[in-house]
Amino acid sequence: MTEYKLVVVGAGGVGKSALTIQLIQNHFVDEYDPTIEDSYRKQVVIDGETCLLDILDTAGQEEYSAMRDQYMRTGEGFLCVFAINNTKSFEDIHHYREQIKRVKDSEDVPMVLVGNKCDLPSRSVDTKQAQDLARSYGIPFIETSAKTRQRVEDAFYTLVREIRQYRLRKLSKEEETTQCIKL
């Protein structure tokens, strides 16, 4: 069974835990209890492949930022979450992305931009703004609602597909560099 190490990042209060718990346990957590760090595992079938998702739900609070480097090193793919009713959380995405690229020492890191809380009647981040940002990064963008479960699986499964493509790219690069000619 293939294992995927997913990390959920974003500012405090954007719904990282709510998204993760909705995926894992199929229910919405209404109360806000800031996370320090929680780990979840779930077996799912994505595109016919049985996968083990190892999901790290991280702290959005700035006082835990020192822990970020460690989980960014071990994560294979990142859900970069902002809340559509919180402009600052959207602006923070850039900092998370830059930190991930720095820690991974790579421009090519599997990521999905997630605009959460799309069930809310008012928004401060326009869908087009988020689509444009995702396009500039070359990553998918998905709007979710942890409350209604809208596109929650889609966000995590899309990240798994991004990791698969990344692994294939890495594999073909390794094959290119290790080819030898027998005389």
Swiss-Prot record:
List the catalysed reactions: GTP + H2O = GDP + phosphate + H(+)
* Example of a GO MF term: G protein activity
One cellular component (GO) term of this entry = cytoplasm
Q: Which PROSITE patterns match?
A: RAS
Q: Name one Pfam family in it.
A: Ras
One of the GO biological process terms? signal transduction
Give the EC number(s) listed in the UniProt record. Answer: 3.6.5.2
Q: Which family does it belong to?
A: Belongs to the small GTPase superfamily. Ras family.
Name-wise, this protein is: Ras-like protein
